[in-house]
A protein has these predicted regions:
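Predominantly a Rossmann-like dinucleotide-binding segment in NAD(P)-dependent oxidoreductases
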Residues: 126-214
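Core-facing hydrophobic residues within beta-strands of well-ordered domains
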Residues: 3, 29-31, 67, 147, ...
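Hydrophobic residues in well-ordered beta-strands that form the structural core
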Residues: 15, 55, 95, 120-122, ...
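Beta-loop-alpha module in the N-terminal Rossmann-like domain of NAD(P)-dependent dehydrogenases
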Residues: 38, 49-112
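N-terminal Rossmann-like dinucleotide-binding module
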Residues: 1-49
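Rossmann-fold dehydrogenase core element
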Residues: 108-126, 146-148
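NAD(P)-dinucleotide binding in Rossmann-like oxidoreductases
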Residues: 5, 211-218, 228-246
């Protein structure tokens, strides 16, 4: 089996707790270099996980001949920059969701991937978890009957520090960094799972609002959409719900 040597751009929570550990545990995969603009953060991460190299410059990591592929685990505002950098260097990349902070950047990433022939994957790993594989099986074998309509209803109370000011606010509610609010962080997985079950969403309408005014980004979203299969769907997300929504 060919071994893939990964380079990480970003040394935050995603690489520490969520996806990062798996890169060193899957057969044929290992992490050989990490990068963070914060030198201490990069060095300590590398030491903690026994990784040989660390960088503070993304281009240097991408240019490292020992690195075969790139995992991009930074906030969405930099996804396009790093993904395009990797693809232009001939290195496939795996990008945390959302793919980018705005639609235009998503188009740029797709265009560069087509031009270079280098793939760029989004971290929609949940579709491969056993639970969701079982759901897919139940839908496809007819156990659940004919699916006529799909609904998403999500509500959660505000998180700690959501009403903080300036740089103390979570980056996930700062549009210049995240692209939007928590919707950008949480909804992609839900919509991806539905698309795996019912085909691509071919038409959609969304209605964002800011109800609580705790931060600049939207905190409530309503949407309607239709899948490739013809099944209609609707959804609502509220990130400033009552405490009972926990």
């Amino acid at each position: 089996m060919k071994r893939i040597n990964w380079g990480f751009i970003g040394c935050g929570e995603a690489t520490e707790k969520k996806s990062g550990p798996a890169f060193g545990e899957v057969p044929g995969s290992q992490v050989v270099a990490v990068m963070s603009r914060n030198a201490d953060k990069a060095r300590l991460y590398a030491e903690r996980h026994h990784i040989r190299k660390w960088y503070t410059d993304a281009q240097e990591l991408v240019d490292d001949p020992d690195v075969d592929a790139i995992y991009i685990a930074t906030p969405p505002s930099s996804h396009a920059t790093f993904a395009i950098m990797a693809m232009r260097s001939g290195k496939p990349c795996y990008v945390e969701k959302p793919l980018a902070a705005c639609y235009e950047d998503c188009l740029r990433i797709n265009r560069i991937s087509e031009q270079t022939g280098v793939p760029c994957f989004v971290a929609y790993y949940r579709r491969y978890l056993p639970y969701f594989q079982k759901v897919k099986e139940l839908v496809e074998d007819g156990t659940l009957g004919k699916i006529l309509n799909v609904q998403i209803r999500f509500s959660a109370p505000p998180r700690e520090f959501d009403n903080a000011q300036g740089s103390n606010q979570p980056w996930r509610v700062q549009p210049l960094i995240a692209g939007g609010g928590y919707f950008y962080d949480l909804a992609p997985h839900q919509l991806d799972l539905l698309q795996q079950l019912f085909g691509f969403i071919i038409r959609a309408h969304g209605y964002p609002a800011n109800r609580a005014h705790l931060y600049q980004a939207e905190d409530t979203i309503s949407a309607s959409f239709i899948f490739q299969s013809g099944i209609p769907g609707s959804a609502s997300w509220c990130f400033v719900g009552h405490e009972s929504a926990k």
